[in-house]
Amino acid sequence: MFCEKAMELIRELHRAPEGQLPAFNEDGLRQVLEEMKALYEQNQSDVNEAKSGGRSDLIPTIKFRHCSLLRNRRCTVAYLYDRLLRIRALRWEYGSVLPNALRFHMAAEEMEWFNNYKRSLATYMRSLGGDEGLDITQDMKPPKSLYIEVRCLKDYGEFEVDDGTSVLLKKNSQHFLPRWKCEQLIRQGVLEHILS
């Protein structure tokens, strides 16, 4: 059936939970592109035959194939665009270093796009706020307090706070730290916020 593979790509994204990135379906995308190539070649052949032979009975078939081509293109672009939006959101959620599990689900071109986006965002943040720049990825929601209590979920090592003091983050240790310094580690799964 026409457009079935393209619709399966869309269903695959729809089934993935929000904030999750399913594995890049290179095989499915290749099948859609092969179907589009076959439809285009059939249409070219029928258009040439309709022009030279005066066969107007081929026009509905040509239009149907053309509509299938357009639908396949829309689905393919929607699949790729939705993946880019999810990858962009991952940069804001996890920071500049993605976990291996997420990188494994990305195509090489998507990793390249992520790295370019990461560089562009870093350049923009350095251009704000004078010499030090401004990290706009922090405090996505306004904090209720400046310091929070956190528990370390795995051994991390030394962690330096702005005033120059160092804290040793060992598994199951608890600390009272500035919220904005902890948010990145919380997203990475190193720390968890202890709610009283």
Curated annotation (Swiss-Prot):
Source taxon at top rank? Eukaryota
| SUPFAM superfamilies reported in the protein's UniProt record | GINS helical bundle-like (SSF158573)
Sorted alphabetically, the Gene Ontology cellular component annotations on this record are:
CMG complex; cytoplasm; GINS complex; nucleoplasm; nucleus
Induction info reads: Significantly up-regulated in aggressive melanomas.
Write down the Pfam families for this protein, in alphabetical order.
PSF1_C, Sld5
Q: Which UniProt keywords apply?
A: Chromosome, Disease variant, DNA replication, Nucleus
An example Gene Ontology biological process: DNA strand elongation involved in mitotic DNA replication
The cellular location(s) given in this protein's UniProt record come to: Nucleus; Chromosome
Q: Read off the InterPro entries from this record.
A: GINS_A, GINS_bundle-like_dom_sf, GINS_Psf1, PSF1_C
Identify the CDD domains for this entry.
Answer: GINS_A_psf1, GINS_B_Psf1
Q: Can you tell me which family this protein belongs to?
A: Belongs to the GINS1/PSF1 family.
User: What is the associated disease?
Assistant: Immunodeficiency 55: An autosomal recessive primary immunodeficiency characterized by chronic neutropenia, natural killer cell deficiency, recurrent viral and bacterial infections, and intrauterine growth retardation. Postnatal growth retardation is present in most patients.
The record's listing under PANTHER family reads: DNA REPLICATION COMPLEX GINS PROTEIN PSF1 (PTHR12914:SF2), PARTNER OF SLD5 (PTHR12914)
Q: What does this protein do?
A: Required for correct functioning of the GINS complex, a complex that plays an essential role in the initiation of DNA replication, and progression of DNA replication forks. GINS complex is a core component of CDC45-MCM-GINS (CMG) helicase, the molecular machine that unwinds template DNA during replication, and around which the replisome is built.
Assembly mode: Component of the GINS complex which is a heterotetramer of GINS1, GINS2, GINS3 and GINS4. Forms a stable subcomplex with GINS4. GINS complex interacts with DNA primase in vitro. Component of the CMG helicase complex, a hexameric ring of related MCM2-7 subunits stabilized by CDC45 and the tetrameric GINS complex.
Q: What is this protein called?
A: DNA replication complex GINS protein PSF1
